[in-house]
Swiss-Prot record:
Bias type Basic and acidic residues, positions: 1-13
Function as written in the Swiss-Prot or TrEMBL entry: Endonuclease that catalyzes the cleavage of RNA on the 3' side of pyrimidine nucleotides. Acts on single-stranded and double-stranded RNA.
Location within or outside the cell: Secreted
Tissue: Pancreas.
Protein name: Ribonuclease pancreatic
Family according to the record: Belongs to the pancreatic ribonuclease family.
Active site, UniProt feature: 12 (proton acceptor), 119 (proton donor)
Catalytic reactions on record: an [RNA] containing cytidine + H2O = an [RNA]-3'-cytidine-3'-phosphate + a 5'-hydroxy-ribonucleotide-3'-[RNA]; an [RNA] containing uridine + H2O = an [RNA]-3'-uridine-3'-phosphate + a 5'-hydroxy-ribonucleotide-3'-[RNA]
Molecular function per GO: lyase activity; nucleic acid binding; ribonuclease A activity
GO cellular component, one term: extracellular region
Species assigned in the record: Ondatra zibethicus
One Pfam family cited in the UniProt record for this chain: RnaseA
Residues the entry annotates as binding substrate: 7, 10, 41-45, 66, 85
Amino acid sequence: KETSAQKFERQHMDSTGSSSSSPTYCNQMMKRREMTQGYCKPVNTFVHEPLADVQAVCSQENVTCKNGNSNCYKSRSALHITDCRLKGNSKYPNCDYQTSQLQKQVIVACEGSPFVPVHFDASV
């Protein structure tokens, strides 16, 4: 079974991320990373930075998560990310996403030993 840390990597890490400038990036990646199985995941963020840099966020600024938990951490610097948002008229199985390239700070929830990201909470 996939661990929480592995799921985070599958859903949110794309360190090569060279093709994120393509308008079809989200449609391809959401399918490839298995987030359009059974339903279309409405919103998802991919981070185009080395995994080690994202894992390092777990030792940066401690902030409260959206759900009230206290194990979220905010990156010191802005990271290259791509936001994928399901278009309003899109229906499963034809999941159609809007692709937006951004540079923002990210907030991730971390847990475990080693202490690693397990949930993408927000970008700010």
